[in-house]
């Protein structure tokens, strides 16, 4: 660099491209902002053709080229021309360097910046230099940062191909109004670290993952458990219903052996069948068994083979599982009730409000797309009035509780049907045997606080199979569940 006098030529627009290079041994003067640079032809040729080689090929070598750009950014460009790798510090420097690399038409530097090993962003006022290698796994690749970069580069390519005058359409430095603390946790998890996270923090991180489109990491944070069922010889996945991804839900078609066998298990929980009465335990007498020593109560048969005669829904967690597992979904809502019909010996689950909306949102598509029998959940919908006399939509679905680990009012209940059949059970419940004509009958209604279910289909019908449930029967029992602050 020097202060030698010479003709100063100011260029602020793009020059025509020429493949000619400059003499390697010549020194050329370039003033960027308030700083004068003396640069050899060999250095300018290192990323040619470019703005400088085009200019000095048409002007005297003693001409001083003046460009009104940032000298600080040009120092990084100058070091790149000298062969050094650019060390970019933050999102502002990255954006400015990319803008000037385009302005000076430096093809190698533009390519290097596009393929740089880091994303630069600012989360809630804190700058982050994020290694792209953290997003190598399927489901994390097409994330927020990759999408923004791709859109920006595509706009620049359109601008270059159309040879439009002026500056390229660059996005401003990346600023995201999210929590930097949560983002640090995300980077730690992507890097393979194990963090002790509370339920509340996990829920917050899941929301952050959705914002940044880190789909695989989101699924890794979702609470789920894979268990092996030795009775069915199948693996099962336990997961909250609101964490289920619709695209991972499938219905496994039954084999001809299972679909053709309309045994007690098939009809065990269907409305209006004798098999239902036996399987649910509503109707058992000594004459049923006779004197046959080999007689096995119907409830036992159901426990072993009910699922084999229903197409149970399966679930494969996106980006995590390679195969589907039998789905056991958990309902946290208390907007669910089990209705035991004493007269018709039926069991139904009544889902209302958010629980009904959630159930329909997760399963309506897969049930309608069933290749054997399309099932429309609207056929299970009824309009009922709540305690404030407001009309709301309910989903009322046939259910089976014969294999359920059931808790009623805080106590284990081994035989719920003995309570229903008791002469003291004279409560009035909704008769759900015909949803088009609703009446009330004697029975028992239990409100669910927490429950786990399987969903099965067969011949165009659906059934909810209770796996585990905690219930309460009335206001006093509900009050017992309320904890002090």
Curated annotation (Swiss-Prot):
Gene Ontology cellular-component annotations: nucleus
Disulfide bonds: none
Gene3D superfamilies: Potassium Channel Kv1.1, Chain A
Coiled-coil residue spans: none
Limits of the BTB domain: 26-121
Further remark: Present with 189 molecules/cell in log phase SD medium.
Organism: Saccharomyces cerevisiae (strain ATCC 204508 / S288c) (Baker's yeast)
Keywords: Nucleus
Main localization (coarse): nucleus
Subcellular compartments: Nucleus
Transmembrane annotation, as ranges: none
Protein's UniProt name: BTB/POZ domain-containing protein YLR108C
